[in-house]
Amino acid sequence: MHGLLLAAGLLSLPLHVLAHPQPGTSLAGRAVDLNAYRMADRASYMSSDEMQAQQPHIASVSAGGYVETATEVVKRVMPGMTFRLVDDHYVGVSGISHVYFRQTMHGMDIDNSDFNVNIGKDGKVLSYGNSFYTGPAPDKAPMVKRDFSDPMQALHGVRKALNLPITADKATVKTVNEHEVTFMGTTGALSDPSAKLCYMAKEDGSLALTWRVETDMGDNWLLSYVDAKSTDQVHNVVDYVSHATYQVYRWPIPDPTEGKREILENPWNLRTSPFTWISDGKNNYTTTRGNNAIAQANPDGGNEYLNNYRPNNKNLKFEYPYSPNMSPPKTYIDASITQLFYSANMVHDLYYMLGFTEKAGNFQVNNRGQGGKGNDFVILNAQDGSGTNNANFATPPDGQPGRMRVYIWTKAQPARDSSFEAGTVIHEYTHGLSNRLCGGPANSACLNGLESGGMGEGWGDFFATAIRLKPNDNRNANYVHGEWVNNSPKGNRLFPYSTSLKTNPLVYTSCNKYNEVHAIGTVWASILYEVLWNLIDKHGKNDGPTPVFENGVPKDGKYLSLKLVLDGMAIQPCKPNFVQARNAIIDADKNLTKGANKCELWKAFAKRGLGTGAKYDPKNRTGSTAVPKECQ
């Protein structure tokens, strides 16, 4: 290989590990601030209305099938650029075709340069997102110049810069292909680290040749972009972690203070889980394992899970004692695992109905020939011993299992187990949803910027809040996130979610004073909470556990809001900002209902400063309460 040792076992694209409610983004136990390494949000988004007004020649493109049409759009918008089709395009349940492209240079990826095209169910171009690099190209291919470091130096550079407890003194480098290697014989990571030679578009408009080093450290699953010439310089870091009969708290009881446990028989939905929750179509289980998830205890916080303890009952009676007063937590581990398994499967089934299917990159072992990549249920670790007072979800690309770690919270006595707080489980699972939808199932690195990462947190809060609405709630209802596990009426967010600007004063420009994803996420979820109630006021509220559809459209406002937000995730560009995500939701409604809710959406966004005149600038966002003329 021309003197370069490169390896076997393809390096997967970014996995997102997102932590639940605790502010601050740092490497677990190592005092390194990952915010300093976040990628800039570089994408542009051309909405349906903008394209009709500014680029009618693009809106009218038609070149046969949806992939061919999308390819032609990229060629016309970015003439002369080289790119490749990412093999994860699909037609969603709303009829929108999603096609994804990655920019290339000298035969190598520019790893943060993406283009996504959305084709409406009418076959016309709906919108597109673009973050292609437009600066000067290197004069020679790096594989010709050989002007880059050994990959082992890159691993050492990452280890030093991020203070990773990886030992590589006896490691060897195994070649995967001309651009990729795997490091064999290291210790300290949960799996063998790997590296891929690729370009990175920098914030200053230049292009850097980098080694993308992947290290799974458990609570952090990192893609570190190390300068290929000076391996002591780390340009950016992506973290994938963000951060029968069942006796359970019935969905969607939020926590043990608001309901009693019940014994539910066969709680699955055969339309969304046709093998039930305890079979994968080939094997039937008598434990908390099935096609969608596998749940177990993980007291030592390790990476192994298949042989970990989980309750087993040949009669399929998962009925175990639990009371919030029980202590220590291990005395009720069976109940904890069962509750976590139940809640995660309920989320799977609901999100499937809303459009998070096999083609869209959902989490299942057996995809039944429905598209996407299988063998990727969610690994659910109850009472995970790797931390306390938190939870996180790791989202690798489609075809690799997601991993949810749920911790014990020590802010009350006795300590509280977050498996029993539905909002925690919904929030974490929603990281998997947003990371698989945004940018396509094969790209899990689209929500690692400050504003895009903040929206990832906000979507988690929004879905958790909307799903937990009570039958008697109206737009005056306020919701606190993380109240029970935190043992605090204020929870762990800046303000309660509320339609009152006195109770919750957050507006779009509030983001100007925040530099942390949970704070920015609270702003985004506060805006979406306005969307929720505007649509409920117009269409009513379905208090059942599943939506009722008419011609593919939820009939009530609660589930319609979830559907539009979910569709918007798939439409928006990789690394979106608030303005682009707003436009994607409006485009989702245009596709789904022909824009029947345009004014309700605009009024909700405008109320909190995301009106027609809102502008994104990472340091000085401009707010607006204006709405389109037809909505005044």
From Swiss-Prot:
Task: Indicate where this protein is primarily found.
Answer: secreted
Localization terms from the record? Secreted
Q: Name one Pfam family in it.
A: Peptidase_M36
Annotated residues for binding of Zn(2+):
427, 431
Note on cofactor: Binds 1 zinc ion per subunit.
- What are the recorded GO MF terms, alphabetically? metalloendopeptidase activity; zinc ion binding
Q: Which residues form the signal peptide?
A: 1-20
Family annotation (Gene3D superfamilies)? 3.10.170.10, Neutral Protease Domain 2 (1.10.390.10)
EC number of this enzyme = 3.4.24.-
Q: Which cofactor does it need?
A: Zn(2+)
Q: Which UniProt keywords apply?
A: Glycoprotein, Hydrolase, Metal-binding, Metalloprotease, Protease, Secreted, Signal, Virulence, Zinc, Zymogen
Which PANTHER family did the record assign? EXTRACELLULAR METALLOPROTEINASE MEP (PTHR33478:SF1)
| Family named by the database record | Belongs to the peptidase M36 family.
The name under which this protein is listed is Extracellular metalloproteinase 5
